[in-house]
Amino acid sequence: DQKGKSPESECNKISEEPKCNEDKICSWHKEVKAGEKHCKFNSTKAKEKGVAVTQTQTAGGTEATTDKCKGKLEDTCKKESNCKWEGETCKDSSILVNKQLALSVVSAAFAALLF
């Protein structure tokens, strides 16, 4: 039962290459930085095996990018590269880029399944 546990942490618990590669959602990485685990979550492999896995996101990741534009004046907002003035507020335009990137990755994966 993997409820409440992130797929990454489940894969990180595996310490043997054969067991890691046998798992439907994990892949073994031979070369890793000091302190990193060899067995890591592999979303591509999980999708290919038909495993529905939602990767848990860290709470701080999206908040930090959203807040950097929040509360800025119009002139300052327009000068910032990742911000844009929308209506009466300064908004983070990089979120839109991230959503488009995610959509294109999903589209490419779907197209690969068709061929």
From Swiss-Prot:
Using the UniProt record, give the first listed, main subcellular location: membrane
Cellular component GO terms, alphabetical:
plasma membrane; side of membrane
Pro-piece positions: 93-115
**Where's it found, cell-wise?**
Cell membrane
Attached lipid, kind GPI-anchor amidated aspartate, located at: D92
Which keywords annotate this record?
A: Cell membrane, Glycoprotein, GPI-anchor, Lipoprotein, Membrane, Trypanosomiasis
Q: How does it sit in the membrane?
A: Lipid-anchor; GPI-anchor
On whether Cell division is a keyword of this UniProt record, the answer is: no
**Sugar-modified residues:** N42
InterPro entries hit by this protein: Variant_surf_glycoprt_trypan_C
Role description: VSG forms a coat on the surface of the parasite. The trypanosome evades the immune response of the host by expressing a series of antigenically distinct VSGs from an estimated 1000 VSG genes.
What name does this protein carry? Variant surface glycoprotein ANTAT 1.8
